[in-house]
Amino acid sequence: MTAIVIVGAQWGDEGKGKVVDLYTESADLVVRYAGGPNAGHTLVVGGEKLIVRLIPSGILRSNARCVMAQGMVVDPGVLVSEIDAVEARGCSTQGRLFVSDRAHLILPFHPLVDSLREAAAADGVRLGTTKRGIGPCYEDKASRRGARLGDLRDMKRLAQLVSRSLEAWTPTLRALGGEPPSLDAILDELTPLAKRITPLLADTSQLIDGALRRGERVLLEGAQGTLLDIDHGTFPFVTSSSAIAGGACVGAGVGPTRIRRVLGLAKAYCTRVGEGPFPTELDGPLGERLRSVGGEYGSVTGRPRRTGWLDLPALRYAARVNGLDGIALTKLDVLTGMPELKVCVAYDTPSGRTREFPIDDIATAKPVLETVAEWSEPIDAARSMTELPAAARHYVEMVEKETGVPVDVVSVGADREATIVRRNAFA
């Protein structure tokens, strides 16, 4: 019985797709437990890129079965499009993809609410959402009026639930200048999608439990990142679900005693999409260089990501709230050739200097930066720590020392093979 959790340790976009794909070589079951189509995972295999927003990253591994658990919110149109894209790659989803009948349904007017709210919000209040309807869907869930994927089996019941949700959102839509779609139009859109999706529905908590009882290796794949967590992130500039490791138990329907290890993913620098505080942000040529070399553009929105120096207090914070016992450090190769290299080691706050991440004062806290040695030698061919330049090796060792957590994986390039694996999470 082995279950491991892979979670983002920053503001998302840490490279979960590649690392999850790496570990699915050893996994029997890959489970996505939170979020929705706002979280795009990019897989690069043989130089070809595939972006999945809903389906777990393990779908390209023929040995792995994939689960979309009840903590997710699902846009049925996006799901069907992804299934078609995966199948077009010659990768069958038949008997390999299972979707929780308890996951909530993103309805066609949820993205409309999201977009209109963002457009109407004033500067400083705008959250910078992906406008995919995630927040409004989770609002329906919390208000106990949402429709779930299992309701696609009964169109009469679905019509009642959609009608109730539409009635609740209509005043908001009209106040924001939008026109709500008709119930008939919504049902016409959902009916053909329901025929594609209902054969995939299952009690996924029971499915996961069965796999664990049989001694199978289960990988629980997070979405977004720790600093976007609804409770532990930089509120209110956060997502609508739990993005930390503890959310895996709730979102997947497994008890905490079933989790063996927690691996946190962190870039060798920091990025953030959308609004919100970002203390180590770089606005000039260095920030643009990180964005250009690192390909830092949102896989869902295409928006340029904000870039900045590695934030060690934030990484220590993520290690604490997730209980990390391993780190996967990604995009180390992007730092190659940087004319200068700095990291944040502490913060100056009104109450003094602290090595902790000042989550409640983050908008006004000032990062304390230290210069570290840079390197110019290409590292994408390295497959062991000894093959790295001394400065790159010391950078990895610094992360271990500052967080107290071993770096198990170092990504030195975009492709699957460009990876240094020091310890397998399933070992």
From Swiss-Prot:
Which NCBIfam families does the record associate with it?
Answer: PRK01117.1, purA
Q: Organism classification, top ranks?
A: Bacteria, Pseudomonadati, Myxococcota, Polyangia, Polyangiales
Q: How is the cofactor bound?
A: Binds 1 Mg(2+) ion per subunit.
Q: Which residues are listed for GTP binding in this entry?
A: 12-18, 40-42, 305, 331-333, 411-413
Q: Which residues bind Mg(2+)?
A: 13, 40
Q: Which gene encodes it?
A: purA
As for what it does, the entry says: Plays an important role in the de novo pathway of purine nucleotide biosynthesis. Catalyzes the first committed step in the biosynthesis of AMP from IMP.
Does the keyword Repeat belong to this entry? no
Q: Which GO terms describe its biological process?
A: 'de novo' AMP biosynthetic process; IMP metabolic process
Q: Which reaction does it catalyse?
A: IMP + L-aspartate + GTP = N(6)-(1,2-dicarboxyethyl)-AMP + GDP + phosphate + 2 H(+)
Q: SMART domains, from UniProt?
A: Adenylsucc_synt
Q: What is this protein called?
A: Adenylosuccinate synthetase
Cofactor annotation:
Mg(2+)
* Annotated residues for binding of IMP: 13-16, 38-41, 130, 144, 224, 239, 303
Q: Under the cellular component aspect of Gene Ontology, which terms does the record hold?
A: cytoplasm
EC number, as in UniProt: 6.3.4.4
What is the annotated localization of this protein? Cytoplasm
Q: Which GO terms describe its molecular function?
A: adenylosuccinate synthase activity; GTP binding; magnesium ion binding
- Which residues participate directly in catalysis? 13 (proton acceptor), 41 (proton donor)
